[in-house]
UniProtKB/Swiss-Prot annotation:
One of its GO terms (cellular component) is nucleus. PEST motif is known to mediate rapid protein degradation. GO terms for molecular function: ATP binding; DNA binding; DNA-directed DNA polymerase activity; metal ion binding. A motif (PEST 1) lies at residues 273-304. This is Protein STICHEL.
């Protein structure tokens, strides 16, 4: 009765299976036409091996033949139903490995391992196996439960709830009992029954060896009608899409044939900790080893058939599913459970400790068998240690995997709780882990879409802009002088990585005569196709690349083959991002470099590369590419791609690429996608810059002081999205191009002299330089400012209000001279040189007289400009200038027919007087003011060859010579008024003519169209000589001017200090400041003399009388008379500058000075007025009155004799002071 029950139950169970399989056949799509994961053509393999469960209470082997007989008797009556592993297919060579199951389990038992072909245990099973126990009984029981679940629910079509209920029912049934019908159904597979029985009773070794042969297994497998039927319908090519369509319906579909270790770390942590265990992840079918008990195979099939493991299984559920639960380690199964996706649907090879000593002959046979079926390796390594297949080598795959061991990286990455293999979310990503130099999928020439990749240089001749680097590397290859380490540094897009690749190809090129790389040999073809095994390119920017670099350095001696003639080149990109530990490993390698190993470091930031590494490398600098080179390459690309491009647009692209060819190619590619003609406007819109035409218009408005239009145009550009910093940089670049004369004006509207650097005048050039200086200073403020738009607009407004070049020169001279009193004597030379550099262009003829200049300018009036236009364009542009010179009328009448002449006409006489009066007020010395107001007259101001020349006339030769000593002070006073660089020429005119020129109405014949001066009788040969002497050595004018100004002021200061000590309080109100050298504006306006001059209350005769009284003070007499004169007159009269007394011409010309005579008849001065005494020198040193070395540089002839008043005894000096 029990037997019939068993039979009825068996039929019922088989009927359910048939019903489920038929439902699956109606729902599932044809995998041959609808699968997206295509398997190889010869991958139609299956394994119909069934696991026989054993009772928990045990059983004898004699029971199995009896059940096998009862099952055999019903074979003819019942319809044969074979279960098919939908996810796993095996080749015949792999199936043969099942026959050796007993022998392998015995070896595993001796090693205290828990690994079987039916199940691969995780933590619990490993612990049981190590503890001894009844681990094998538990393994077989769990295997039977796993098979039972798969056997009953393989093609289940229920929803997830049905799947969960089926799983629960399977668990309950497996815990209660083992059905006899189950054993009856499995009795058809007699050899397998004996194998399972042997697992329960380990003592039946003979029966196990007799029944476990692979031939019987092949017969049973081939006799499966279900398998044959599925083969006819092309179901053998079921892909992972079939898995995705079924895994929602199935309860379990795990394979029991082989469960791989994910990595070295997973195998070591959960099994016997064999360091040589490496598994490759390629999404192929399971590997089942045969005769030699080898489970070591890292060459897996590329067909993504799937391992049959439901990725939704949890760790808890996997403990009750036998062999399937260990296919994924605990940490990896968590990831699979969380993601719910099929990350790994292929097989992984299990490598055992005892298999390391297996022979390589079987590996060759097994690989040859797979190669015959069209199976290509995904991750494989050649026998010489390079990448490639292990076919034809003497090394086993386990040894090769030990050498490379990519999955050792997983063990290192487990420190942060993540697995290296789980970072990939697809099978395509798993193919990128190869270290054999193969390119990733999608990088073949047919699939390349980027211009930078499509037109990447493949030979040295195709590299542009790096001639020095290319020549050096070519010579190194030609002469076989290869360094172990190279360092390529430079900005992005300059060809560093391309050069490294070409260099690696040239190292292994076998060409003898041609240029390397030749492109024809096998090595060059492998390199160009991306299949080179001697080139490894790693990225130091990500953690995976850094881990790979660390692994290579650690295992470099074992990776490299012995006696290899090929160079192994390792290119490490972004090496400056590598951690310090990796650099220490590199340092060990650099100290003891290996033969035929070359490292190439590529970096854009040399500062972050350790100095010790830099000193051991051959460094090559990759400069930015020239715009012309980039344009040539862009033209070639545009021609090859049939792009409609404007040549000016290519220039603009190259200019905005900043020396990077990659950026230029990317820009061109983006513009080509717009489907329009590539023009400059399109490039500007893409890059986000402002066109040169708009910049020129903005610059012209800013320089013309058009405030409203400047602000309006600046706002328009900013509203368009332009960056103020970029605008300012563009303006600065534009100004530099204009100054250099290299700017090419496209628009005719702007093709005037202002934008052509060759036609710029001195004033225009100074204005542009000043604008460039303002822009450069404002850019610094702009980068740290929060309101950049306001700063930019304010800077533009400053460009229009800039001072004229003359003001700049005068101000700079004044500032330089004002520091002279406190600086050392060497500062005078520095000031002179600086001043000379600023106005070095002002060079005049030595023998130019007023008459000759006027004549020349009159005859060639077209070469000169009227002074009125100069004044209007420069002096009166700003409000400050208009306050100094009244704006009523113009200085010269433009309607006048003689506007082209160089002399001012009658209408300008009042203006000349006004200018002369203002010049006198700005003189720093009272004596000079009196002298100029009394005897000097400004008769004309003219412009000669771009230089402003002022003619000042004196009626007496002695006064003229005296005024020439103050030439520098007079020049500075006039420059402050006119705000231009002026050359002052002092001439001698008869007194009668001198009085007529300013006070009487000019006669029409004084100036005519020819420009001659007809009615001035004093312009004779003598006048020419005098003028020639006054303008002698004009090339040294700046030097002489500054030195004379400093010397005059020091003399004046020293004389006033000496006079102040004798009569305190008498001249306090006219005492100048100590640090004052050159006149500042309104310095002496508050003095009594200045107020008297400005009020013009004194007549010429009165001024002459006061000057005569002052001269009387200089008469040398006894001390009492001198003291009395000083007491009575000093409070009312200004002191006379002692410069005349300490000059050689004073003694020679004393008879011609009109009252200047010495009482003692000696050439010299009274000691009271002399500053050149020893006591005064010491006092000036104590008070730090600088300038003594300047006096020491004076001609020794100008010093007084030791027997004069300057050398009187100290006692006499004390008496005088008392």
């Amino acid at each position: 009765m029990s037997g019939s029950r068993v039979s009825d139950l068996s039929k019922l169970h088989l009927k359910k299976e048939l019903t489920q399989i038929r439902k699956a056949g109606r729902v599932l799509r044809d995998p041959g036409t609808t699968s997206s994961w295509k398997s190889p053509l010869d991958s139609s393999r299956s394994v119909a091996l069934l696991e026989t469960p054993a009772s928990r209470n045990g059983g004898s082997s004699s029971q199995f033949p009896i059940r096998g007989e009862s099952s055999t008797n019903r074979r003819g009556k019942e319809k044969k139903v074979f279960l098919y592993n939908w996810k796993t297919q095996k080749s015949s060579s792999e199936k043969s490995g099942l026959a050796k199951n007993g022998k392998e389990e015995e070896e595993e038992e001796e090693d205290a391992s828990s690994w079987t072909q039916a199940s691969v245990n995780d933590d619990d099973d490993v612990s049981d196996a190590r503890n001894g126990g009844d681990s094998y009984r538990r393994e077989i029981q769990s295997a039977s439960m796993g098979f039972r679940c798969r056997d009953t629910n393989l093609a289940s079509q229920g929803v997830s709830k049905m799947r969960k209920s089926n799983v629960g029912s399977c668990k309950k049934k497996s815990k209660k009992k083992i059905s006899s019908s189950r054993l009856d159904c499995l009795s058809k597979y007699q050899p397998r029954d004996d194998i399972v029985a042997r697992n329960c009773n380990a003592g039946s070794d003979d029966t196990e060896e007799e029944l476990s042969n692979s031939e019987d297994l092949r017969k049973v497998t081939g006799a499966s009608p279900l398998l044959l039927k599925l083969k006819q319908k092309n179901w053998s090519r079921s892909s992972s899409r079939l898995l995705r369509a079924n895994n929602r319906k199935e309860d379990s579909s795990c394979t029991y044939n082989s469960t791989p270790a994910l990595s070295t770390s997973s195998y070591n942590m959960y099994a016997v900790r064999n360091p040589s265990t490496v598994g490759s992840w390629d999404g192929t079918t399971t590997s089942v080893n045969d005769g030699d008990d080898e489970l070591d195979d890292n060459l897996d099939l590329p067909g993504r058939q799937g391992c049959g493991i439901p990725c939704y299984w949890t760790k808890k559920a996997m403990k009750h599913r036998g062999g399937c639960r260990s296919c994924c380690s605990p940490s990896f199964s968590d990831t699979l459970r969380r993601t719910g996706s099929s990350i790994l649907c292929g097989s992984q090879s299990v490598y055992r400790r005892h298999n390391r000593h297996s022979s390589g002959g079987y590996s060759k046979q097994k690989i040859a068998c797979r190669s015959a079926q069209g199976v290509l390796p995904l991750l494989s390594y050649g026998g010489d240690g390079r990448g490639g297949s292990s076919l034809g080598t003497g090394l086993s795959d386990d040894e090769l995997s030990t050498n490379y061991g990519e999955l050792d990286l997983e063990a290192q990455s487990r420190l942060d709780g993540r697995r290296w293999s789980t970072s990939y979310r697809s099978q395509d990503g798993l193919e990128a882990v190869a270290l054999d130099g193969e390119e990733e999928e999608g990088s073949t020439p047919e699939t390349i879409r980027s211009f930078s990749q499509k037109y990447r240089p493949m030979f040295f001749e195709e590299l542009i802009g790096q001639s020095i680097v290319v020549q050096s590397l070519m010579n190194a290859v030609k002469r076989s002088r290869i360094a172990p380490v190279y360092l390529f540094q430079g900005p992005r897009g300059t060809g560093k990585t391309s050069t490294a690749r070409i260099f690696s190809a040239a190292l292994n090129c076998v060409a003898t005569e041609e240029m390397k790389p030749c492109g024809y040999c096998k090595e060059c073809n492998d390199f160009m196709s991306g299949k080179s095994k001697d080139f490894w390119e790693l990225d130091g920017a990500n953690k995976k690349g850094a881990d790979k670099v660390r692994y290579l350095l650690k295992n470099l001696p074992t990776i490299l083959p012995r006696n290899s003639s090929m160079y192994k080149v390792f290119v490490i990109d972004e090496c400056h991002l590598l951690p310090s530990k990796t650099w220490l490993s590199f340092l060990k390698f650099l100290e003891n470099p290996l033969q035929k190993v070359v490292f190439i470091f590529i970096t854009t930031d040399l500062e972050n590369v350790p100095r010790t590494i830099q000193s051991r490398c051959q460094k090559f600098l990759f400069d930015k590419l020239k715009d012309s080179d980039i344009v040539v390459r862009l033209k070639k690309i545009a021609s090859d791609e049939n792009l409609d491009v404007d040549l000016h647009a290519l220039d603009l692209i190259a200019m905005n690429a900043d020396g990077s060819l990659r950026d230029a190619e990317t820009m061109l590619e983006q513009l080509s996608l717009l489907g329009k003609r590539i023009t400059t406007a399109l490039v500007n819109e893409l890059v986000g810059v402002v066109s040169d035409e708009k910049l020129l218009e903005l610059l012209e408005l800013a320089l013309s002081s058009d405030t409203a239009e400047t602000v309006k145009r600046a706002r328009e550009l900013l509203d368009l999205g332009a960056d103020p910093i970029v605008l300012m940089s563009q303006l600065a670049s534009l100004i530099m191009d204009i100054i250099a004369g290299t700017y090419k004006v496209v628009d005719e509207k702007y093709s005037n002299a202002f934008f052509d650097g060759r036609n710029l005048t001195e004033a225009d050039m100074e204005g542009l330089k000043h604008a460039l200086k303002l822009l450069s200073e404002a850019e610094k403020q702009l980068r740290v400012s929060n309101d950049r738009s306001t700063w930019f607009t304010a800077t533009l407004l400053q460009l229009g209000s800039m001072p004229s070049p003359g003001t700049t020169h005068t101000g700079s001279s004044r500032r330089q001279s004002s520091r002279a009193t406190d600086d050392d004597p060497a500062s005078v030379s520095r000031e002179v040189m600086a001043y000379k550099q600023r106005i070095g262009g002002l060079h005049f003829s030595k023998s130019a007289s007023p008459a000759s200049v006027i004549k020349r300018n009159g005859n060639h009036s077209h070469e000169a400009k009227p002074f009125s236009r100069v004044i209007d364009n420069n002096c009166y542009k700003s409000s400050s200038s208009s306050q100094m010179i009244e704006s009523e009328g113009s200085i010269a009448s433009h309607e006048n027919s003689i506007a082209s002449t160089m002399m001012l006409n009658q209408r300008s006489s009042e203006k000349l007087n006004d200018i002369w009066r203002k010049c006198i007020e700005r003189c720093h010395s009272k004596t000079l003011r009196q002298l100029l107001y009394t005897h000097g007259k400004l008769i004309s101001i003219s412009e000669v060859e771009g230089i402003l020349v002022a003619y000042i006339a004196f009626g007496e030769n002695d006064i003229k010579l005296r005024a020439e000593r103050f030439l520098s002070s007079i020049t500075n006073s006039i420059e402050m008024v006119l705000r231009r660089s002026v050359e002052v020429r002092i001439i001698l005119l008869p007194e009668t003519e001198l009085l007529v020129v300013p006070h009487q109405t000019r006669k029409p014949e004084m100036t005519n169209k020819s420009g001659h001066l007809n009615n001035i009788a004093g312009l004779n040969a003598e006048t020419d000589v005098e003028v020639g002497s006054s303008v002698e050595s004009r090339s040294k004018l700046p030097m002489q001017r500054i030195e004379s100004i400093i010397r005059e002021q020091r003399l004046e200061t020293a004389w006033l200090q000496t006079a102040d000590k004798d009569t305190p309080g008498s001249i306090i109100r006219v005492k100048p400041e100590r640090n004052q050298i050159l006149p500042q504006e309104d310095t002496y306006r508050q003095t009594n003399v200045a107020s008297a001059i400005s009020s013009s209350g004194l007549t010429t005769h009165q001024w002459v009388d006061e000057l005569n009284n002052e001269v009387k003070l200089l008469k040398i007499g006894d001390n009492g008379e001198l003291q009395e004169n000083l007491t009575g007159t000093r409070g009312q009269h200004c002191p006379l500058s002692p410069s005349l007394l300490h000059d050689t011409n004073f003694g020679n010309n004393k008879d011609n000075l009109g009252g200047y005579e010495s009482g003692s008849g000696r050439v010299g001065c009274n000691i009271l007025f002399c500053w050149n005494t020893k006591k005064t020198q010491r006092r000036s040193k104590s008070k730090q009155v600088k300038g003594t070395p300047v006096r020491s540089r004076r001609n020794r002839k100008s010093r007084f004799s030791l027997f004069n008043g300057c050398a009187k005894p100290r006692k006499a000096e004390g008496n005088i002071r008392r």
